[in-house]
């Protein structure tokens, strides 16, 4: 009988073997628990048109499930807004929270495959940190991910990606994400 050992994600291995030590030296952390790490990644797709056509939410859910490898949560309107023809409880978006190995694999695919496929991409803005080391950015279309078949896209949908870190300052978060391979613009 053979035992199969679990394969660790490539980016997680690199973080544990190289990045963590360099960040500890860079910031002078006395305790290993003070070293910044990625806590979770939240991928959100807002579909405002779903208020008029409920079938649009299915395409977004399928796209998000293919991209992240996890079934998305359908987000519903919390209150009615007459100007948008929106009623409480109507589906208006889909969200996935990634943690653990799925998170590391998604970040690896994002930095090595998806971001380089964006047309006229010159790097991510380094000013989109929230003050405590978390980074949020948006993608204009879902076709940059290789899991999406371009011929089967019913409509172009953008998404917001929020990378939550355990960093306490923007500089720590920026250093962590740069070490993980995020291509920031040089200002």
Swiss-Prot record:
<keyword id="KW-0694">RNA-binding</keyword>
<comment type="subunit">
    <text>Part of the 50S ribosomal subunit; part of the 5S rRNA/L5/L18/L25 subcomplex. Contacts the 5S rRNA and the P site tRNA. Forms a bridge to the 30S subunit in the 70S ribosome.</text>
</comment>
<dbReference type="GO" id="GO:0000049">
    <property type="term" value="F:tRNA binding"/>
</dbReference>
<dbReference type="InterPro" id="IPR022803">
    <property type="entry name" value="Ribosomal_uL5_dom_sf"/>
</dbReference>
<dbReference type="InterPro" id="IPR020930">
    <property type="entry name" value="Ribosomal_uL5_bac-type"/>
</dbReference>
<dbReference type="GO" id="GO:0019843">
    <property type="term" value="F:rRNA binding"/>
</dbReference>
<dbReference type="Pfam" id="PF00281">
    <property type="entry name" value="Ribosomal_L5"/>
</dbReference>
<keyword id="KW-0689">Ribosomal protein</keyword>
<dbReference type="GO" id="GO:0005840">
    <property type="term" value="C:ribosome"/>
</dbReference>
<dbReference type="Pfam" id="PF00673">
    <property type="entry name" value="Ribosomal_L5_C"/>
</dbReference>
<dbReference type="InterPro" id="IPR031310">
    <property type="entry name" value="Ribosomal_uL5_N"/>
</dbReference>
<comment type="similarity">
    <text>Belongs to the universal ribosomal protein uL5 family.</text>
</comment>
<comment type="function">
    <text>This is one of the proteins that bind and probably mediate the attachment of the 5S RNA into the large ribosomal subunit, where it forms part of the central protuberance. In the 70S ribosome it contacts protein S13 of the 30S subunit (bridge B1b), connecting the 2 subunits; this bridge is implicated in subunit movement. Contacts the P site tRNA; the 5S rRNA and some of its associated proteins might help stabilize positioning of ribosome-bound tRNAs.</text>
</comment>
<keyword id="KW-0699">rRNA-binding</keyword>
<protein>
    <recommendedName>
        <fullName>Large ribosomal subunit protein uL5</fullName>
    </recommendedName>
</protein>
<dbReference type="GO" id="GO:0003735">
    <property type="term" value="F:structural constituent of ribosome"/>
</dbReference>
<dbReference type="InterPro" id="IPR031309">
    <property type="entry name" value="Ribosomal_uL5_C"/>
</dbReference>
<dbReference type="GO" id="GO:0006412">
    <property type="term" value="P:translation"/>
</dbReference>
<keyword id="KW-0687">Ribonucleoprotein</keyword>
<dbReference type="GO" id="GO:1990904">
    <property type="term" value="C:ribonucleoprotein complex"/>
</dbReference>
<dbReference type="InterPro" id="IPR002132">
    <property type="entry name" value="Ribosomal_uL5"/>
</dbReference>
<keyword id="KW-0820">tRNA-binding</keyword>
